[in-house]
């Protein structure tokens, strides 16, 4: 197992080495199983586009469980109905939004060649997709890089906003603010026009419509459970000519979750995501131009507790 799985001293899974072609992302190890992909969510954590040397125990399992929850909401017809989908040529028709998930069980062909136990609860078996090279960011509240850009320009990714907004204010309507994708290095916020010039207006419009619809439907589900989704990023790909939701969805790594009963604009909010790590690093002496420092054990465990609390509030049951 030592060659297959790498853990840190706290038991967080930092890396996997399965006997299949692998592509390693910031958090996930993606394996090519021939006709499908195996996505393994490690316990790595990234911040400011750097991978930290410290893992967050059980983070990968929590991410997978939350993605599974949201994909199940889509399957149940609570998210993305009658929005439309687009083919690779940008053609559209009214239909439900599809996703790439096949299963969250460890495949038999994988379990036959490695110890499957460390993988249990942290894998997604998915269809292969041609990935759209933009992250589809939706912001319902003004925080993070959006808040910083607004302070400087009064806009976020080319979207003009009213004057006088405070940090974490709710926007009158959610806005679509794409970003370029980067496996390594820094993602870059761009305007919708930049995306449209790259992908074409038809597909860009469809991505915006689908992203806003998923965010709005998911926000209603979260609100029923006392949670606010401040912002999130989606990824899409084309499978057999159909544009569909891929990768993780509405997890603490891709989204900011706040408690509705604690919400108070004008300052940063207590969150159930990795903002806790971001704030710790911002207050440290790290210059963001060099490899980040290890997290103290207390910060890693408090972050794990935040992830777990967010999951349990959302799903309504204890994380096992």
Swiss-Prot record:
Keyword list (alphabetical) reads: ATP-binding, Ligase, Nucleotide-binding, Purine biosynthesis
User: From its record, what is one biological process in GO terms?
Assistant: 'de novo' IMP biosynthetic process
MF annotations from Gene Ontology: ATP binding; phosphoribosylaminoimidazolesuccinocarboxamide synthase activity
Q: Which domain of life is it from?
A: Bacteria
Enzyme Commission (EC) number: 6.3.2.6
Enzyme type, top EC level = ligase
What are the boundaries of the region Disordered?
Answer: 283-303
Which Pfam families does this UniProt record tie to the protein? Answer: SAICAR_synt
Q: Keyword ATP-binding, does the record have it?
A: yes
Q: Which family does it belong to?
A: Belongs to the SAICAR synthetase family.
UniProt name for this protein: Phosphoribosylaminoimidazole-succinocarboxamide synthase
**Which gene holds the coding sequence for this protein?**
purC
């Amino acid at each position: 197992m030592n060659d297959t799985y790498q853990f840190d001293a706290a038991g967080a899974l930092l890396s996997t080495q399965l006997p299949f072609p692998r592509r390693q992302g910031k958090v996930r190890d993606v394996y090519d199983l021939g006709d499908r992909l195996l996505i393994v969510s490690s316990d790595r954590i990234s911040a400011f586009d750097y991978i930290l040397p410290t893992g967050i125990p059980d983070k990968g399992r929590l991410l997978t469980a939350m993605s599974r929850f949201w994909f199940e909401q889509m399957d149940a017809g609570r998210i993305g109905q009658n929005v439309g989908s687009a083919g690779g040529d940008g053609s559209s028709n009214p239909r439900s939004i599809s996703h790439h998930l096949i299963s969250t069980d460890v495949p038999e062909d994988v379990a036959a060649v490695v110890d499957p136990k460390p993988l249990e609860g942290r894998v997604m078996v998915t269809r292969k997709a041609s990935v759209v090279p933009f992250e589809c960011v939706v912001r319902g509240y003004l925080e993070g890089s959006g808040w910083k850009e607004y302070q400087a320009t009064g806009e976020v990714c080319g979207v003009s906003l009213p004057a006088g907004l405070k940090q974490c204010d709710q926007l009158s309507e959610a806005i679509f603010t794409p970003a370029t994708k980067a496996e390594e290095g820094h993602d870059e916020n761009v305007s919708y026009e930049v995306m449209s010039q790259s992908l074409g207006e038809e597909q860009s419009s469809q991505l915006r419509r689908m992203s806003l619809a998923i965010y709005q439907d998911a926000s209603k589900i979260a609100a029923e459970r006392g949670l606010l989704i401040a912002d999130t990023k989606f990824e899409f790909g084309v499978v057999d000519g159909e544009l569909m939701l891929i990768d993780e969805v509405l997890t603490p790594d891709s989204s900011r979750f706040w408690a509705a009963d604690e919400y108070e604009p004008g300052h940063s909010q207590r969150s159930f995501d990795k903002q806790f790590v971001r704030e710790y690093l911002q207050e440290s002496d790290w210059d963001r131009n060099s490899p980040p420092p290890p997290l103290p054990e207390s910060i890693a465990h408090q972050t794990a507790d935040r992830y777990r609390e967010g999951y349990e509030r959302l799903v309504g049951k204890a994380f096992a």
